[in-house]
Amino acid sequence: MSQQDSPANADHRRRHSSIVVDGPGKAASRAMLRAVGFTDEDFKKPQVGIASTWSRVTPCNSHINVLADAASDGADAAGGKGVVFNTITISDGIANGTEGMKYSMASREIIADSIEAVSGCEGFDGVVAIGGCDKNMPGCMIGLARLNRPSIFVYGGTIQPGAGHTDLVSVFEAMGAYSQGNKSLIEVKQIEEVAIPGPGSCGGMYTANTMASAIEAMGMSLPNSSAQDAVSQSKKDDSRAAGEAVLKLLELDIKPSDIMTRKAFENAITVVIALGGSTNAVLHLIAMANTIGVELSLDDFTEIGKRVPVLADLRPSGHYLMSELVAIGGIQPMMKILLDAGLLHGDCLTVTGKTLAENLADVTPYPTGQEIIKPLEAPIKSSSHLRILYGNLAPEGAVAKITGKEGTRFTGRARVFNSEEEAQARINDLTVAAGDVVVIRYEGPKGGPGMREMLTPTSAIMGRGLGDKVALITDGRFSGGSHGFVVGHITPEAFVGGPIGLVEDGDEITIDAENDIMTLHIDDAEMARRRAAWKRPAPRYTRGTLAKYAKTVSSASKGAVTDLPEALDD
């Protein structure tokens, strides 16, 4: 009896696709698939969905169609049938500083939803997801975790440096310098024209490179996937190898839940800290852990951060770009250093089918004399740059990125703004001055909605030369390219009645990153008076994507996810 004649299928690798294409009752399904190139033999193979985030809206993703085809070819060569489909991407770099940036965090959920929906509908047995821009990585991973089918993530790769060692953040900071009168429009345009030379994700240890590195450390990417140039043969080879590797995962029945364990998340956090990675990793890793059923909290970043140093001299706080780290071996040699020091769990399973320790056993050390990754005995910072702060301004926590260059303590007078646009106008017209604590509120997950990145304001502050003289705190978040004395993810957010919504102009605020405390210097009676007088503002959106997002999204301290049971029960 042929496979089409019988729904019974002994091949455990086809437990999903067999339901869709096997047996006489599925003739219509097979007819549809024949029209997109399936043959009789293809119906007998495991189907591998290739989730591509290709788009021409951003250079981060403009090459991913080539990588998706390579992954599909790899799946075919290994005995499967690759099927490419697309999900969305937006561009944080284009949208930053505009209302459109409110869609950025929502896009993470849309990516996850669409990967889950297409793969669940089509009956893919395994999935390769390929991401480039910031929200692609966690969006893809949340989608893969929900499906819990044999899967691999492929990073689209990093961009090359622009002329003069420039990148996207160079442009934002040039704009800030222009507002201060320190650069001419001609100088800004000269940087604008060369900073982004072609495809690939933003070049520093910003959010995209941070999350790609975290996913590799977690074991959900092939070794070295996070550290390859976007336009390179090695990245095409990585994509093809991922397609092949999914067939091995199907054979061994290794699923994301077997890899994304508590120890694997601890490995990811360790590598993020060692690389000096983005604050957004806190938000995204907590969201990914929530999806796969692993308990992870803000305090885990504090505990791990006590024993893990910052080793990488990478932008935005350091000097080098990801392409330069690629040239000396990527993150694998650093992971071997961390493993040998007892800072990584070597027994974690990975998508190679081997443990992390087995993957790292024969890694070549960094070349002698390189200055990008510092030795453990002489780190850039002896403990984490990611600080989790509490206090009467952030009873449920806040996230700061403190390298030490900007100091570890700041006291100043509050300059309060109820939107990013309000703050940006006052920074640009030079109203904001040294000694100020810029407070940007009603920019949280629900209040914004969408938890916009404050890259434009922080870049303007840096461009004015005030990086160590002005602090910025917000219930929004920051780009991986933000640096300076900045604290974000303040919870509870203003829109739900958090204390940041009670701050008034002129209030004294202290940010103490040594003791991880953020204090609004008013007494309890005054706090109570203000709380009694506070009224929640009307929602900014009542229809559409952002209204739905605001209704279902959780607190930033829980990863700003949209499928927590308590949100869905409302």
UniProtKB/Swiss-Prot annotation:
EC number: 4.2.1.9
Keywords assigned by UniProt, alphabetized: 2Fe-2S, Amino-acid biosynthesis, Branched-chain amino acid biosynthesis, Iron, Iron-sulfur, Lyase, Magnesium, Metal-binding
N6-carboxylysine: residues bearing it: K135
Domain of life of the native organism: Bacteria
Name of the top EC class for this enzyme: lyase
GO molecular-function term, one example from the UniProt record: 2 iron, 2 sulfur cluster binding
Catalytic function, reaction form: (2R)-2,3-dihydroxy-3-methylbutanoate = 3-methyl-2-oxobutanoate + H2O; (2R,3R)-2,3-dihydroxy-3-methylpentanoate = (S)-3-methyl-2-oxopentanoate + H2O
Binding site for [2Fe-2S] cluster: C60, C133, C202
Cofactor mode of binding and number, as noted: Binds 1 [2Fe-2S] cluster per subunit. This cluster acts as a Lewis acid cofactor.
Gene3D superfamilies per record: IlvD/EDD C-terminal domain-like
Cofactor (UniProt): [2Fe-2S] cluster; Mg(2+)
Active site: S479 (proton acceptor)
GO process terms (BP): isoleucine biosynthetic process; L-valine biosynthetic process
Pathway(s) the chain acts in: Amino-acid biosynthesis; L-isoleucine biosynthesis; L-isoleucine from 2-oxobutanoate: step 3/4; Amino-acid biosynthesis; L-valine biosynthesis; L-valine from pyruvate: step 3/4
InterPro entries named among the record's database cross-references: DHAD_IlvD/Edd, Dihydro-acid_dehy_C, DihydroxyA_deHydtase, DiOHA_6PGluconate_deHydtase_CS, ILV_EDD_C, ILV_EDD_N, IlvD/EDD_N
Binding site for Mg(2+): D92, D134, K135, E453
Chain spans, region Disordered: 1-25
Role summary: Functions in the biosynthesis of branched-chain amino acids. Catalyzes the dehydration of (2R,3R)-2,3-dihydroxy-3-methylpentanoate (2,3-dihydroxy-3-methylvalerate) into 2-oxo-3-methylpentanoate (2-oxo-3-methylvalerate) and of (2R)-2,3-dihydroxy-3-methylbutanoate (2,3-dihydroxyisovalerate) into 2-oxo-3-methylbutanoate (2-oxoisovalerate), the penultimate precursor to L-isoleucine and L-valine, respectively.
Similarity section: Belongs to the IlvD/Edd family.
Assembly information from the UniProt record: Homodimer.
NCBIfam families the record matches: ilvD, PRK00911.1
Protein name: Dihydroxy-acid dehydratase
The species this protein was found in: Chromohalobacter salexigens (strain ATCC BAA-138 / DSM 3043 / CIP 106854 / NCIMB 13768 / 1H11)
Gene: ilvD
